[in-house]
Structure formats: C-alpha cells, structure tokens
Amino acid sequence: MLVNNFQLIEEYMDSHPCKEGEFHFLQIIQRNKENPNLGSNNHVIREYMVENSEYLEKHKNEISILCQLFNARAYIHISKKTYKDVGFQVLNTLAEYLSQENYHGAKHLYSTSVGRCKSSDKTFLVDIDTKEKEFVNECINCINIYCQPFDNINKVVLTVPTLHGYHIITKPFDLRHFGESYPNIDIHKNNPTLLYYKEK
C-alpha cells in the first residue's frame, strides 16, 4: 500500500506560507516496527528543513527513493519552527549534554533541539485508526462544535491519510470532552504527520 501526501502538504504550505526564518521539519525514519533487525530504536535516515512547497517538490523524488530503499517513512511537522529558536535550543541542549558528559548524544543535537522547541503555530494531532469516513467526520464535528474554544468552529486545519486511518491536524482545543467521547483515540501535541510510505 502506498501513502503519498506530497500534494496535500504542498497545498497546505501554499495556503499557510512560512514567514522569514520559519520552516517545517521533515525526517525520513526507519521504524523498528517495519525493520525488526534495527533493534529497539528507530533510525533517522535524513532530515530536511522545508521552507516552502517548491523545496518539497524539488526533493520529492529523493525522499520517495530513500523511503523505498530503506523501507522507511517520511514524516513532516505541520507546526512551524524558527531557526532562531532552534539555534538557542541547540546551545541549551549542548550545555546539558556536556554537563552530563553525554558526548555521544551530541550527534543528535540538532534534531533533538528541533523536537524541544515550541512551535510558532502549535497544533494537535488526532490519530484515527480507521478509514471509515462517517466516523472521521463525526470526530471532526466533535472537535469543531463541542470542544472549547467554542468561538472557533474551524479548529481542524488538515486531514492527512495514513496507512490505516487519518491524522486530523487541529488548532489547540480543550481535550476533556473529546477524551470522554473517544477515550481510545490518541492525541499528540508535538508529533509529525505521515508524508510518504510505500509498504513492502
């Protein structure tokens, strides 16, 4: 099965362009779930700082080939980061590593720092594990209509197909009502969404 969300993400970027100094963080990741020989940890193949849809389109073939070659997935953060914030976070993270004598951790310094940075446009990711459109629309209506803030009835910014369902990307909302209505659905506050994966 193929999941190819390049066009969807590029259209989103065109309608929500990055400001000067902002970027979307993209990683190609080998997961141990699909590659049991990796052991307990996932493996990052390559990372990209994506500032616009043109950059993503330019690297589309490269990303697709790497994913197929390594049986990996391409994930992209819809929330934007800034180079300035990441730069300061790199200094803080490096100081932390050095004080703990964790010199080995320095090789992951930039990606760790990006992950720790607050986004300039925070989003939630609602992980739906079904392709049933009626259920997905029910979840979207619950978020938009029945979850605070009530003055914003367009909290859902993007619905991204995944291998077994959808990632509903939203603006922040009060999780209590949704959690009570759908206790088995996971909501993540700093997670990327699936850009590309070709199942072997």
Where are these regions (language model features)?
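Polybasic, proline/glycine-rich intrinsically disordered low-complexity segments
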Residues: 182-186
